[in-house]
Amino acid sequence: VLSRLLSLQQADAAFPSGSFAFSNGIEGLVAGDPAFDTASLIRTLTGLVRFRWAESDRVALILAHRAAPDPARLGRIDAAVEAAALVEAMRVGSRRNGASLLTTHVRLATPGADELRAAIRSGPMLGHLATVQGALWRALGLSEPEAAAVAGYQLVSGTVSATVRLGQVGAIQGQQALQAVLPLVAEIAERPVPEEPDDAIVLTGFTPLIEIAAMRHARADLRLFAN
């Protein structure tokens, strides 16, 4: 029961993870499509989960969960995340969000958080969000499926929240979109992830519309979110 409660704590929007500052590309999409609605949001969430999170961030998180607290192995997973993130705004955002989450856990005295911060400062690690999540949540006692479920939920709920804050959909419509994609998140969170050697960590993702929108968003004069 404790691990479930800790999972709820980590997934809670009130938990200071720093994710409120990031829209996962949704602000750029909305700016380019005034007709963006609930159906558009569901399609976007589905694409994020199926074509980026499933085989990129989720895989990195699971591998980091297994590797913790080995900083060398975590650093190689971080390097794979860096290589897989083609858009600078998303790449930098991942590191910034990872740093924010880690700072909170350092202040909460989560086991291993100080060592993770030292590994990032000294060089073996870059501190991408998925890597930090996997290492920290293992230290809290979350299982691999629990950690994946929390990360998947944070991705979709954070994207929904950003869309609501942008005024593009209402709160009820946002929750309808969230409900529509949760079964997909649950199914993917339970998929097995094979162990991969350091020289063969493969993270794949293909979300071109979101990535193009994020690149345009990075040059916008007025922005509510960091990406």
Task: Pin down the residues of each PLM region.
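Metal- and O2-centered redox machinery and metal/ROS homeostasis
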Residues: 1-227
